[in-house]
């Protein structure tokens, strides 16, 4: 974080007490330097790019601090963010943990060559991985969408710090490597030995397709200042989640203004996290050139959507999002798409998505969405919307309009907006501090990237022919609207 942003953060936090916000010496924010207490990996996949060419997703998490840590690792499928696996992970000081998400005959699983402690134990055998499960969307938990294990093949990942492990305790002894291997032998006092965390986690995900000759590496989004309390939960518990943010205060910088906003009295505990992820416009590039047989997919993941959207056929979830989750139709939110080529020409064609969403306007309907251009389907997703274009290269804009008081196009009043409590606003240009009695964030809480592939076929070399395919991942650029 640069010096100006640090100064604005400190000044704004210092003024929050004037709004009656208590315990606000810490507030959740997206750390642009990539370190935090909670990490969100926007996408994993083990789908086939084409038949017989599956992806593997390689995950890493690093503890950069001098304290051992307990963290919750959670995998969520991409349609409705139903949990498919979670476990507790223990990282010793300066530790790294890695794992691979791989395809199985019916779904997906995970294995790790790493010896850091997990409870329950995660398989180290790639031929017999720890399997993802469908318990959270079948039987009494069914959401009227696909109930098969195939649904586990794509989604996203959360890693949430439960806390630091006190030095000199039996738990720290159990997780500390001795000659490269921790004993992992005694977690009986893990809850008592865990205190509030201090962040310092970072991580990466690589989507690799060996047979296609492509990989896409993406950094995890880091939430800093997530909790001032220990968040210990037993293995198998659905806690902690992103709704455990504490205190319920967010810090967001846009332009010269830094907003420190109180969410302590709003209906949903996760609002502070949604606020730091809110964007009203998302931008990125695309390449579809014939010569290089290029393709482009965009990933747009909304990691807090599940906290707002109930299951059912109604179109009036409580706040922020437009529609309930309606089985295989998903939960659709309207979006305006504008296309630009590299020579300033633009196209904005309502209803351009294919297949048409069930709401008859351009919309994204899942929690981990993949938007492909000209059906190039770089990632092989099933949670897919297609944007046709006549441009071979350029950039796109996705706009999420909304208003707290009136309809905005096809978006009803009160949707695509999140209204919080008071804010302290610090302006780095003028050095002044002001206050808002209510604060409106417009847009949707979305993260993601563009995956661009290029295929040059095989090239003859001194050692024989080699495959010359390439892939790159590019984080989205965004704007914010806060009033």
Model-predicted segments: where are they?
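Solvent-exposed, conformationally flexible loop/turn segments
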Residues: 92-97
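A structural motif detector for short, solvent-exposed N-terminal "entry" segments of globular domains
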Residues: 28-62
């Amino acid at each position: 974080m640069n010096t100006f942003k640090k100064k604005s953060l400190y000044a704004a936090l210092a003024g929050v007490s004037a709004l009656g916000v208590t315990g606000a010496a810490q507030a959740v924010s997206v750390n642009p330097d990539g370190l935090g207490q909670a990490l969100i990996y926007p996408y994993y996949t083990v789908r086939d790019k084409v038949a017989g060419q599956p992806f593997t997703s390689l995950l890493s998490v690093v503890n950069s601090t001098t304290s051992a840590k307990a963290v919750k690792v959670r995998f969520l499928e991409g349609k409705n963010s139903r949990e498919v696996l979670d476990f507790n992970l223990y990282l010793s000081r300066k530790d790294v943990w890695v794992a691979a998400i791989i395809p199985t005959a019916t779904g997906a699983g995970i294995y790790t060559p790493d010896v850091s402690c997990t409870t329950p134990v995660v398989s180290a055998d790639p031929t017999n991985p720890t399997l993802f499960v469908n318990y959270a969307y079948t039987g009494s938990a069914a959401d009227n969408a696909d109930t098969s294990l195939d649904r586990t093949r794509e989604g996203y990942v959360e890693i949430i710090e439960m806390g630091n492990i006190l030095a000199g305790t039996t738990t720290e002894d159990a997780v500390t490597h001795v000659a490269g291997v921790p004993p992992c032998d005694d977690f009986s006092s893990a809850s008592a030995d865990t205190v509030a965390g201090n962040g310092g986690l970072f991580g990466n995900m690589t989507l690799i397709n060996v047979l296609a000759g492509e990989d896409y590496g993406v950094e995890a989004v880091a939430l800093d200042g997530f909790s001032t309390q220990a968040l210990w939960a037993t293995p198998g518990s659905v806690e902690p989640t992103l709704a455990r943010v504490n205190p319920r205060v967010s810090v967001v910088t846009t332009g010269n203004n830094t907003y420190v906003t109180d969410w302590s009295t709003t209906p949903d505990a996760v609002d502070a996290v949604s606020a730091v992820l809110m964007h009203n416009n998302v931008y990125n590039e695309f390449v579809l050139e014939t010569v290089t047989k290029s393709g482009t997919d965009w990933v747009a993941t909304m990691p807090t959507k599940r906290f707002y959207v109930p299951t059912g056929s109604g179109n009036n979830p409580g706040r922020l999002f437009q529609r309930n989750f309606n089985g295989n139709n998903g939960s659709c939110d309207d979006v305006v798409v504008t296309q630009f080529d590299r020579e300033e020409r633009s196209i904005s064609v309502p209803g351009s998505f294919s297949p048409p969403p069930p709401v008859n306007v351009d919309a994204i309907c899942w929690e981990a969405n993949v938007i492909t251009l000209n059906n190039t389907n770089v990632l092989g997703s099933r949670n897919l919307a297609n944007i046709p274009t006549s441009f071979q290269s350029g950039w796109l804009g996705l706009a999420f309009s909304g208003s707290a008081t009136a309809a905005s196009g096809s978006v009803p009043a009160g949707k695509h907006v999140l209204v919080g409590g008071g804010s302290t606003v610090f302006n780095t240009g003028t050095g002044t501090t002001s206050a808002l009695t209510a604060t409106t964030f417009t847009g949707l809480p979305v993260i993601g990237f563009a995956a661009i592939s290029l295929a040059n076929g095989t090239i003859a070399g001194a050692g024989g022919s080699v495959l010359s395919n390439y892939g790159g991942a590019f984080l989205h650029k965004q704007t914010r609207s806060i009033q």
